[in-house]
């Protein structure tokens, strides 16, 4: 069991992050310790500042898993510029529903080092050509 539950921050274009959180809640029930930041209306520096502010709103000892939609988009770039001293912030791009379900289902029982590769694998496995 994880001694300190990791928290989730989704940084996405438009309302994608909010809709993903709503969809997770419809499947697993409401999830605590999750927030979103949209890039809408922000400059590059403004988006980075908004992300930093959100990270600081979480408990100081909680590891933050920062999900972005596109690695090369404004959200991915801003997350790479993030500098929050004294915080554990792990970043993963290409957020999708299978990845988030894996995170919320296992964040209380697996360490971050176990959980992150599992989330990546589940996210990739969720992409199937039929």
Predicted regions located by residue number:
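N-terminal loops that bind phosphate or other acidic moieties
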Residues: 1-130
């Amino acid at each position: 069991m994880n001694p300190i539950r990791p928290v989730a921050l989704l940084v996405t274009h438009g309302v994608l992050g909010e809709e993903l959180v709503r969809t997770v809640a419809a499947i697993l029930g409401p999830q605590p310790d999750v927030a979103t930041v949209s890039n809408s209306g922000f400059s590059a520096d403004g988006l980075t500042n908004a992300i930093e502010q959100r990270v600081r709103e979480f408990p100081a000892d909680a590891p933050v898993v920062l999900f972005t939609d596109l690695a090369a988009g404004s959200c991915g770039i801003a997350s790479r510029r993030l500098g929050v001293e004294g915080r554990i912030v792990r970043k993963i791009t290409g957020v999708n529903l299978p990845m988030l379900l894996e995170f919320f289902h296992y964040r209380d029982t697996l360490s971050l080092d176990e959980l992150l590769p599992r989330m990546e694998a589940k996210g990739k496995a969720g992409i199937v050509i039929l």
